[in-house]
Amino acid sequence: MPSETLWEIAKAEVEKRGINGSEGDGAEIAEKFVFFIGSKNGGKTTIILRCLDRDEPPKPTLALEYTYGRRAKGHNTPKDIAHFWELGGGTSLLDLISIPITGDTLRTFSLVLVLDLSKPNDLWPTMENLLQATKSHVDKVIMKLGKTNAKAVSEMRQKIWNNMPKDHPDHELIDPFPVPLVIIGSKYDVFQDFESEKRKVICKTLRFVAHYYGASLMFTSKSEALLLKIRGVINQLAFGIDKSKSICVDQNKPLFITAGLDSFGQIGSPPVPENDIGKLHAHSPMELWKKVYEKLFPPKSINTLKDIKDPARDPQYAENEVDEMRIQKDLELEQYKRSSSKSWKQIELDS
């Protein structure tokens, strides 16, 4: 009997996986995508490195960074692949959000929003700008995908609702984010020293936003115990590891609320005197919470939220030969501009 060729062996292996994957509930796609966005210097890189067991100091993310991790679910099984994308610069690089989110990645895509709890005045605008920009692009991709694969879009929407029990009292009141969303409040070690009333407003506001979007919410710091809990959540997104069902809603402790386990009844109304609520003139619950939050933590000018520093001049990325050539080209450009300006003036005089 002739020996099998490499292609025949590969074909048989693929068919074998297909048969095994069709048993039970079906095998999950072994490739997932996790996109980290959030506050500038909020700790996104640290969380990613911790999840991948990489013992290296985090470096500032210049624009859009990519890395990946691999993990086997069992002995002698193919390793699942998780693609990690990270957007740097806070809200200054919103245009780059579209790069990791495509029709090919969307079906196994998750979003992680990391918010710096130590800077409460920046928290709402950072959260709002990033979530709006991401949702807008995801909606466009879903609409385009729906024209060619309506079944995939339907399955995605159903999957989003799976986190919310059908008998949940808020089932008709929430508007789940179009992809799985986890909101992480970082630098809890600084946040825990805030005044009680400030912590209360921040905690209740983030609980409302997370529950409204069908998202998980948790706080973290440099504490090894908290980082391990966050690692477990990210591993669930990246590798399908069992989801934690633990919950902590005590504002005097780090919040940890898995999607679907909170409720508007438990969160309560916005922390503002009842006679003041009518004066806020909000058109939706989300707008009401925003007005209440920004009354205590007024946002800084939008210009201050953007990173105006030129990355090309960052000493961390210095390269002598390239930098010298850049200086030379900048000088040549200035000379060209002056020369062109003189030429046009001469033409105007001659005419």
From Swiss-Prot:
Keywords: Cell projection, Ciliopathy, Cilium, Cilium biogenesis/degradation, Cytoplasm, Cytoskeleton, Developmental protein, Disease variant, Dynein, Golgi apparatus, Microtubule, Motor protein. It comes from the Eukaryota. One of its GO terms (cellular component) is cilium. It is found in: Golgi apparatus; Cytoplasm; Cell projection, Cilium; Cytoplasm, Cytoskeleton, Cilium basal body. It is linked to Short-rib thoracic dysplasia 15 with polydactyly: A form of short-rib thoracic dysplasia, a group of autosomal recessive ciliopathies that are characterized by a constricted thoracic cage, short ribs, shortened tubular bones, and a 'trident' appearance of the acetabular roof. Polydactyly is variably present. Non-skeletal involvement can include cleft lip/palate as well as anomalies of major organs such as the brain, eye, heart, kidneys, liver, pancreas, intestines, and genitalia. Acts as one of several non-catalytic accessory components of the cytoplasmic dynein 2 complex (dynein-2 complex), a motor protein complex that drives the movement of cargos along microtubules within cilia and flagella in concert with the intraflagellar transport (IFT) system, facilitating the assembly of these organelles. Involved in the regulation of ciliary length. Light intermediate chain of the cytoplasmic dynein complex 2, a multisubunit complex composed at least of eleven different proteins. The cytoplasmic dynein 2 complex consists of two catalytic heavy chains (HCs) and a number of non-catalytic subunits presented by intermediate chains (ICs), light intermediate chains (LICs) and light chains (LCs). This is Cytoplasmic dynein 2 light intermediate chain 1. It comes from Homo sapiens.
